[in-house]
């Protein structure tokens, strides 16, 4: 609501060079409220279900599953549900914001020549598939909502894997938030120029807030997050095997 009130409503007229596609929260990088939302995405993604494995161990349900030899089915179903919950929690605020922008701001295609499209060049790397951004802007938004869904789900998966090592629900919730902060800080030190290209959350934006976007980097980061989750869950399952 603050984003709509402060960063959308005052600039809703077409004379300001904005349309839905350039001012919604996923595509506009000049807002502190959007920055705060993306900062909290790892925490929000973990809250719905990432602590389920820990809760099931504490209640004894996980031990019951083990005695029934249903461990693989348990983890398969848990990961899918946790991934879906984390992804939905990530894109739900973005979808609501997009809908509100459609109610207030003109539905006009971005114009590379006439409008200030906030550093989205046709041949640059501020976003993936820039030609789609100009020719089919709504499709471009839907594509990045899908990417944001995947990023949120994968981060929730990492938190789920960490719940096999942690004994406190709150620590499970904040674990990925802390790890993501430390990771971004480390990458920022190692790669002083273009560090944001290697941040997973960069690809939850339609337009990169800093640096550039690379499709190969995004795919690699997603594979790494999935790999970390699988290794962590296997390690945790081994650690909590019944004697």
What are these regions, as identified by a protein language model?
Residues 1, 82, 177-181, 226:
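Residue-level recognition of pore/gate-forming positions within transmembrane alpha-helices
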Residues 161, 165, 223-243:
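Junction motif at the cytosolic side of a transmembrane helix
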Residues 169-183, 201:
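Central hydrophobic cores of alpha-helical transmembrane segments
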Residues 2-51, 80-156, 160, 201-222:
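Secretory targeting signals
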Residues 52-85:
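Helix-loop-helix units of permease transmembrane domains in multi-pass membrane transporters
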Residues 8-12, 98-110, 168, 188-196, ...:
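Transmembrane helix-loop junctions in multipass membrane proteins, especially transporters and channels
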Residues 76-77, 172-176, 221:
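Hydrophobic core positions of alpha-helical segments in small-molecule transporters
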Residues 1, 68-71, 167-169:
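Short loop-to-helix capping motifs
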């Amino acid at each position: 609501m603050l984003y709509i009130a402060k960063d959308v409503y005052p600039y809703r007229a077409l004379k300001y060079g904005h349309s839905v596609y350039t001012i919604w929260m996923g595509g506009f990088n000049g807002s502190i409220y959007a920055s705060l939302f993306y900062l909290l995405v790892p925490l929000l993604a973990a809250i719905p279900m990432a602590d389920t494995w820990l809760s099931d161990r504490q209640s004894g349900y996980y031990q019951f599953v083990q005695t029934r030899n249903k461990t693989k089915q348990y983890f398969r179903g848990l990961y899918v549900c946790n991934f879906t919950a984390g992804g939905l929690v990530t894109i739900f605020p973005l979808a609501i914001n997009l809908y509100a922008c459609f109610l207030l701001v003109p539905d006009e295609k971005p114009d590379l020549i006439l409008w200030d499209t906030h550093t989205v060049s046709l041949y640059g790397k501020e976003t993936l598939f820039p030609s789609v951004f100009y020719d089919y802007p709504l499709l471009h938004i839907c594509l990045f909502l899908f990417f944001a869904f995947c990023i949120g789900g994968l981060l929730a998966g990492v938190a789920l894997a960490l719940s096999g090592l942690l004994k406190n629900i709150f620590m499970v919730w904040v674990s990925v938030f802390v790890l993501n902060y430390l990771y971004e800080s480390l990458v920022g030190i190692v790669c002083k120029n273009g560090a944001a290209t290697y941040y997973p959350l960069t690809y939850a934006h339609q337009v990169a807030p800093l640096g550039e976007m690379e499709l190969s980097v995004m795919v690699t980061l997603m594979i790494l997050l999935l790999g970390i989750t699988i290794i962590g869950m296997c390690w945790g399952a081994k650690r909590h095997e019944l004697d």
